A protein has these predicted regions:
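Conserved catalytic core of nucleotide polymerization and phosphodiester-bond processing enzymes
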Residues: 1-235
Length: 235
């Protein structure tokens, strides 16, 4: 899509195969509004891409994925409008609210997910960011300092928070279904579920379970894949 080349031409032996690496690193780095810096952080220069190529790759990826790009801006605008008006904003099954706790004097920007669960951004306020653009700021615990500090966010970053949270909620539905079958979930890692099951339980049964529709996500296509092993390992 990015390079207007049929997918079957991107095969070893074809000159178009050189586009594969560009597309791969772009997909990894640009899905949540990343730019040239994100490409470099993902190792684009070490993969043989020239720095002067990167802005074009960013623009090509965004042009090839307009719905993803538009989602970043819709999320950002909903969050900003919520903060500016203190009125709830609803988009794509999400509800943005500015909420307060009168007992403890706390305030939050919240995003209600399709599952009903909420994301919380503590003590939010509007302020220009380092690019001179009005942006949402909030308090968070710094990864390095482990202390409360102010962070700014933007549409792509909030989209990442939302997408990963929804993915977690989908996995949680599967965990509940597995539990209802009487099977033991030993642990789970990101999008993987490790089950200690009798030999009579097949991988296909579990994969079918993971593909079952979720009531709060009608139309969402789900698919599972798995394997059997005597101990945990990567596929």
């Amino acid at each position: 899509q990015m390079f207007h080349v049929p997918i079957e031409k991107i095969a070893k032996g074809n000159p178009e195969y050189s586009l594969r690496q560009k597309g791969k690193v772009a997909t990894l780095a640009l899905g949540y509004q990343g730019g040239t810096a994100a490409l470099i952080a993902m190792g684009a220069l070490n993969m043989g891409l020239a720095e002067e190529e990167l802005p074009d790759i960013v623009q090509r990826w965004r042009s090839a994925n307009p719905r993803i790009r538009d989602l970043w801006y819709a999320v950002e605008q909903a969050a900003l409008t919520t903060m500016q008006t203190a009125q709830p904003q609803g988009i794509y099954g999400l509800i943005f609210r500015y909420e307060g706790d009168l007992v403890y004097g706390q305030s939050f920007l919240t995003v209600q997910l399709p599952s009903g669960r909420k994301l919380f951004y503590p003590k939010p306020f509007l302020q220009e960011n380092q690019f001179g653009k009005m942006a949402i700021h909030y308090y968070t615990v710094g990864q390095q300092t482990r202390k409360w500090e102010v962070a700014s966010t933007y549409g792509g970053k909030m989209t990442e928070n939302i997408v990963q949270a929804i993915a977690r909620d989908c996995l949680a539905e599967t965990l509940k279904s597995i539990d209802r079958m009487g099977l033991q979930v030993v642990f789970h890692v990101h999008d993987e579920v490790i089950i200690d099951a009798p030999v009579s339980i097949t991988v296909d049964e579990i994969c079918d379970l993971m593909a079952e529709p979720i009531p709060w996500a009608p139309g969402l296509i789900l698919k599972g894949a798995g394997f059997e092993s005597d101990y945990y390992m990567k596929d």
